[in-house]
Amino acid sequence: MEIFKLINQELQRQQDQIELIASENYVSEAVLRATGSVLTNKYAEGTPNKRYYGGCEYVDQIELIAIEKLKKLFGARHANVQPHSGSTANAAAYLALLQPHDKVLAMGLNDGGHLTHGSKVNFSGKIYDFYHYNVDPNTYLLDYDEILKKAIEVKPKLIVCGASNYSRAIDFAKFRQIADHVSAYLMADIAHIAGLIVAGYHQNPVEYCDIITSTTHKTLRGPRGGIILTNREDLIKKIDSAVFPGELGGPLMHVIAAKAIAFDEALQPKFKTYIKNVIDNSKAFCEAFINKGYQIIANGTDNHLFSINLFKKFNLTGDLVENWLYQANIVVNKNMIPYDSNKSMNPSGIRLGTAAMTSRGLVQSDFVQIADWIDQIIKAKGDLNVINKVKSEVKKLLVKYPIYQDRDY
């Protein structure tokens, strides 16, 4: 069938290309097995032991295992594993805490925030009244004093911290102080850094934030999905009711099973080693660009990602460089940078991440080599001879790091 042919072609693409998109990763064979299991046949509207359908005795056990493992990972009192994505987790969190047109303060999209943090084209910006804080225009770092001033001015009901493109550590304790000062709820969207948090390489928001949302892929290395956490007893029912029946009908039980497996994998000692390698690789990768004279947003990284300003020094846009690199089998994504004068489809930057290729086994020296390849292509302004030379070297490198060797669709 044509679909299976295309899946095999996608498998080959993943094998042959260097994946530097910060929101992508490679799941384990066990996670793949669960995602493609017979659990996809089962409708299980409701929550464990409170379903609206019969025949749920096994999926009840699966969901309860997922919940308990997730609570253990974060040290949280309560967890909901049903959201289909990070966006639906955020939507449910807002539904639990807010009324339409309530004020919310979140990170600006260009500064590193997410569409669901109040973009005017997103449901969040249409239903709620979002205001935004920005990074410092010189350092591109969060300025907590300025965020406090903005919070006092806006008087939001909810403050959202967390980002989709911020390379430095986030101080949840400081955000808690700001939220308390204006009597606001505090929500952390940790979609990108969840893996770092559970491995102990980033401050845990659970003790500081009223509600925490995340994806289960990215650095957590699970299936595509979302989660919600809280330590507040008075919010548990509101959160669960916001997910079902407020937002979702039937949960995806095959994905919840895959989440449970990924959570168990993240509880193992080798996951902490993996995350340390992700961060070490990211720092080495970033430093290689700094040594070549590139402008790195926030002048470095504390996590799995960083962004490069291509426009200031090279007068290049992210879409152009993304295309050049893709021709050489290097996959990145174009990205807006703080205070960007360009539009979203031809922004000034690219974003790079190390989580996926670290999963494949690449080490710091490999990332230094990749930085050199990217530098060659950028400085040659996409010359095809340079692109083809790099592409052949990329293929030689990746032969040493195969993925899903026994898979065939």
UniProtKB/Swiss-Prot annotation:
Record bears the keyword Transferase: yes
GO cellular component assignments: cytosol
Ligand binding ((6S)-5,6,7,8-tetrahydrofolate): L109, G113, H114, L115
GO biological process, one term: glycine biosynthetic process from serine
UniProtKB keywords: Amino-acid biosynthesis, Cytoplasm, One-carbon metabolism, Pyridoxal phosphate, Transferase
Pathway: One-carbon metabolism; tetrahydrofolate interconversion; Amino-acid biosynthesis; glycine biosynthesis; glycine from L-serine: step 1/1
Chain positions with N6-(pyridoxal phosphate)lysine modification: K218
Family assignment from sequence similarity: Belongs to the SHMT family.
Designated name of the protein: Serine hydroxymethyltransferase
Naturally occurring in which organism (per UniProt): Mycoplasmoides gallisepticum (strain R(low / passage 15 / clone 2))
Lineage of producing organism: Bacteria, Bacillati, Mycoplasmatota, Mycoplasmoidales, Mycoplasmoidaceae
